[in-house]
Amino acid sequence: MAKEHSVYELNRIQQYIMQMRPVLKKEALFSDGTKDYRNPTEPEAGEKVTIRFRTGKNNVDIVWLCTDCEHYKMKKTESDREFDYYAVEMTMGEEPFYYYFEVASGLLHVFFDRYGVSKERRDAYRFCIIPGFSTPEWSKGAVMYQILVDRFYNGDPANDVLTDEYYYIKTPSKKMEDWNQCPSDFSVGEFYGGDLEGVRQKLGYLQNLGVEVIYFNPLFVSPSNHKYDIQDYDHIDPHYGKIVVDEGELLQSGTTDNSKATRYVNRVTNRENLEASNAFFAELVREIHARGMKVILDGVFNHCGSFNKWLDREKIYHANGGYEDGAFLSKESPYRSFFGFRDENGWPDNTSYEGWWDYDTLPKLNYEDSEELYDYILGIAAKWVSAPYYVDGWRLDVCLLYTSPSPRDRQKS
């Protein structure tokens, strides 16, 4: 006669059997945003999207696609020698659609997101579909060449940054006389003289390499060689473009006051220099396009630089005249709302502005409280993809870390 088991014993037996399943093959779990796992990849609002997920063959019990509010059980639709494939169909709304996956194998539950397998849900790494957002066909699979201009090629020595031209991050600017000399450990103020004329002279070389897209690191006015601390979004840095009026003095040894760096002030604020540099860039883009290549710019819109004309911590624009007071100098500045200040009684020379990762050379842009800033940046995005520049697109720096123009607004601009 067969032995009868209590409910408790049956539960223990069931748990034992579940635990005896093959070990979960975490390395087999996979999904991404390509057409193999999301079809269509760039849906419109109201369109149905098939989302797929891969597992090891006969290795899991259940796969769910998860949103903030719901778990949707996925159906096994296909298998091959090594893998099973699960799918579910979702209808897109108007808003971004965020999702991740949960996988059950016996008593083991794991999650899968853009960063892979995890024991816990990670909202920051969810997959995202933005209905109505698409990327141009020319960008898909294109051969892209990234250029940090200062380190590419010096085509015009007349625009080189000079030694002692100005002072930045506890060091004076330095012109590197030997192109082959290795940069120092802290080289933000060391300049090798690469410029846009150098890029123009090497376009044939780039074309022969098979380059289809040139992606420029930031080109706008900035005191550093990397230029992720932008001083003026409206103009190409004359040190990369054209210096047609070159007047003023270098800093005296030991001087740190950039309002006295009159050579630098003239170079980066003189209207003739700025307009000539913008015009040269427009010509360069036309020549790049004539060779069948595209151009992408680097959009650094999360933060700017302490030299920026909206803040003007260095009093470069205040000393030059013809510019509004920066928000560092005056609470009445028209740019006051562009930055978040912790001390409302800190003016003049209010150092309490919020910096990205607390770096005072990288003031955080305050989109949350400034509709004017929001509109200004959208205008900048539109300016450089319009006549006479006709840039083909933007790469957005640290775009996940700031509240800024929405993806849909950026696309429209």
Task: Put a short name on every predicted segment.
Residues 2-140, 145-146:
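Glycan-association/targeting regions that enable binding to alpha-glucans and other polysaccharides
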Residues 60-62, 97, 110, 154-156, ...:
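Intrinsically disordered, low-complexity acidic/polar segments
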Residues 142, 149-212, 218-388:
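Substrate-binding/active-site clefts of carbohydrate-active enzymes
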Residues 370, 399-401:
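Short beta->alpha junction loops/turns
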Residues 385-392, 400:
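Alpha/beta-hydrolase fold catalytic core
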Residues 402-411:
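Conserved small/polar residues in nucleotide/adenosyl-binding loops
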